[in-house]
Curated annotation (Swiss-Prot):
Glycosites: 254
Superkingdom: Eukaryota
The protein's role, per its UniProt record: Part of the gene cluster that mediates the biosynthesis of the lipopeptide antibiotics leucinostatins that show extensive biological activities, including antimalarial, antiviral, antibacterial, antifungal, and antitumor activities, as well as phytotoxic. The function of lcsT within the leucinostatins biosynthesis has not been identified yet.
Signal sequence range: 1-15
PANTHER family per the UniProt record, alphabetical: NAD(P)-BINDING DOMAIN-CONTAINING PROTEIN, OXIDOREDUCTASE HTATIP2
Keyword annotations from UniProtKB, A to Z: Glycoprotein, Signal
Entry's induction text: Expression is positively regulated by the leucinostatins biosynthesis cluster-specific transcription regulator lcsF.
Protein name: Leucinostatins biosynthesis cluster protein T
Length: 269
C-alpha cells in the first residue's frame, strides 16, 4: 500500500513513525519543501522536494499514481506568516491537493489534520481557519450527506463532490509526546511558548486528569495511520463526530483502545 505524507513538523513526525511500523504500508512518499532526516535510510520512503504545494506536475502525479491515501499535516505556523499566507497554507493548499490526489485512485483517503473544538471556538482565529478548511474539504467528500453545516461568514462556494474522494479529519488538541522517544531526535528546538506548554501545562493537565483536551502522540499516530489505510467507511467509536468522519482527542483515545482490543469492531483496515 502506498501512502502520501505532507508536513515534517511534530505531527508529520508522528505520522511517519506510525507508518514506518505498519507492515501493510510498503511505500511512503513524502512531499516536502526540504530534506527529511527522519526518512533517511528508510527503504520504503521516497522524498519529493517541492517548494510549491499548490500544483503537481505530471511527473509527480505519475509517481503518486495508485496511492491509497494521504495524511496532510502541512501548514505554516501563524507567527511566521501573514494571515493571508496562513489561510492559504491551511485552507487553499489542502483543498488543491485533495482535488489533485482524488484522481490517483478509484478511492482515495485524505486525512486532514485539523484541531479539536475548531467548530465550537471559532472566535479564536486559528480554530476558525481549521473549521473553514473542513467545510471546504467536506464539499469534496464523495458522500454529500456528510457535508458540514456552513457557518463561515458569507458562506463558501458550493462545489461538486468527487466520487473517489474519502475524507477523514483528525482533530488533536494538546499533544503529549513525552514518552515517544522515536520521534524526539527529529524535532526542531522548541520556542519558549512550546517549552512552557510541554514543561508546565501538560504535566499539570495530566495530574488533574484533563484528558478531554489532550492526548498522546501514540494515539494520534495510530489514528492517522489507521484511517489513511482504512476502507473508507464511517468511524464508529465513542467520541467520533456526528457524521462519523472525524476524531478529536477523546475519540482518538477510544479509537486506540477499541483497535487494540477488537480491531474488527472499528473501521476495517
Amino acid at each position: 500500500m502506498h501512502i502520501i505524507l505532507t508536513g515534517t513538523g511534530l505531527v508529520g513526525a508522528i505520522a511517519l513513525d506510525a507508518m514506518l511500523q505498519e507492515s501493510s504500508i510498503d511505500k511512503i512518499t513524502i512531499i516536502s519543501r526540504k530534506p527529511v532526516p527522519q526518512a533517511e535510510g528508510q527503504s520504503k520512503v521516497e522524498v519529493i522536494i517541492q517548494e510549491d504545494l499548490s500544483t503537481y506536475s505530471d511527473e509527480t502525479l505519475a509517481k503518486l499514481k495508485g496511492a491509497h491515501g494521504c495524511i496532510w499535516t502541512a501548514g505554516p505556523p501563524l507567527m511566521a506568516v501573514t494571515r493571508q499566507e496562513y489561510e492559504y497554507g491551511h485552507i487553499d493548499l489542502p483543498v488543491k491537493a485533495a482535488k489533485a490526489f482524488a484522481a490517483l485512485n478509484d478511492k482515495f483517503n485524505f486525512v486532514y489534520v485539523s484541531h479539536d473544538g475548531c467548530h465550537d471556538t471559532r472566535a479564536v482565529y486559528i480554530f476558525d481557519v481549521k473549521a473553514r478548511a473542513e467545510e471546504k474539504l467536506f464539499q469534496l467528500h464523495h458522500d454529500p450527506s456528510k457535508r458540514l453545516e456552513i457557518k463561515t461568514k458569507g458562506g463558501i462556494e458550493e462545489q461538486e463532490s468527487l466520487s473517489s474522494f474519502v475524507l477523514y479529519c483528525i482533530r488533536p488538541a494538546l499533544i503529549d509526546y513525552s514518552t515517544h522517544d522515536a520521534i524526539k531526535p527529529w524535532l526542531k528546538p522548541l520556542p519558549l511558548a512550546k517549552k512552557w506548554t510541554n514543561g508546565v501545562i501538560l504535566p499539570l493537565y495530566r495530574f488533574l486528569g484533563l484528558t478531554s483536551i489532550m492526548g498522546t502522540s501514540q494515539e494520534l499516530g495510530q489514528a492517522m495511520k489507521d484511517l489513511v489505510i482504512s476502507d473508507g467507511r464511517d468511524v464508529d467509536v465513542a467520541g467520533a463526530s456526528p457524521e462519523g468522519r472525524c476524531l478529536g482527542a477523546v475519540g482518538m483515545r477510544n479509537w486506540t483502545q477499541a483497535r487494540n482490543e477488537s480491531p474488527e469492531d472499528t473501521v476495517a483496515v
